[in-house]
Structure formats: structure tokens, C-alpha cells
């Protein structure tokens, strides 16, 4: 397989909501940061299991221009400052592909 080194990168978020109010605060602050780094939320909502078991009930897929940009977003001080709110809002995991 010949992979394009300039391909888009995707962050896949899986989570279970702990606190809907905290989730709303987190989303209102995280979404502009995603856009600031050229990211786009492609899908958000409950998972529909096609095969296997799902440990998490909700998901989100975010596209970034490339892997370096996705990692820069996640490690940005402005995003890292939101982790306390995020962790109160969700039991989650983030994965990167691309």
C-alpha cells in the first residue's frame, strides 16, 4: 500500500457522558480551538455497533489537515487547559489515525 504522507489525520473520540452541563462548557470552548487548527468535526453522537462490543456509547470524528496539526491541537496549552472540564464531562479516550 502506497500511503500519501500528506494525508488528513483523524482523531476518533469515544466516550460516556458523566455531566451534560460540563460537556456543554467543554464543547463550547473546544470547538473553536478545533477550527483554529484547521480541524472539522465530521460526526458526533451515539455509536451504532456494527460488530463487536462498544465500551463507550458516544463518539466523535475530527479531521485535521495532517497528523502534526492534530497533535499540535491536542498539545496546545489552550486545549490542555480544558482537560479538567473534559474529564469531568466524559469518561473518554482519544485515538489518532492518519
Which sequence ranges carry the predicted segments?
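C-terminal structural segments of small proteins and small subunits
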Residues: 67-95
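Short S/T/G/P-rich N-terminal loop/turn motif that feeds into the first structured element of a domain
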Residues: 1-58, 63-75, 98
Amino acid at each position: 500500500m502506497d500511503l500519501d504522507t500528506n494525508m488528513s489525520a483523524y482523531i476518533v473520540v469515544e466516550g460516556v457522558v458523566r455531566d451534560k452541563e460540563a460537556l456543554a462548557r467543554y464543547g463550547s470552548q473546544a470547538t473553536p480551538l478545533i477550527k483554529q487548527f484547521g480541524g472539522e468535526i465530521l460526526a458526533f453522537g451515539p455509536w451504532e455497533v456494527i460488530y463487536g462490543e462498544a465500551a463507550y456509547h458516544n463518539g466523535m470524528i475530527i479531521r485535521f489537515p495532517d497528523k502534526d496539526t492534530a497533535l499540535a491541537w491536542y498539545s496546545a496549552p489552550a486545549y490542555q487547559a480544558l482537560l479538567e472540564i473534559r474529564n469531568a464531562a466524559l469518561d473518554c479516550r482519544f485515538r489518532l489515525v492518519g
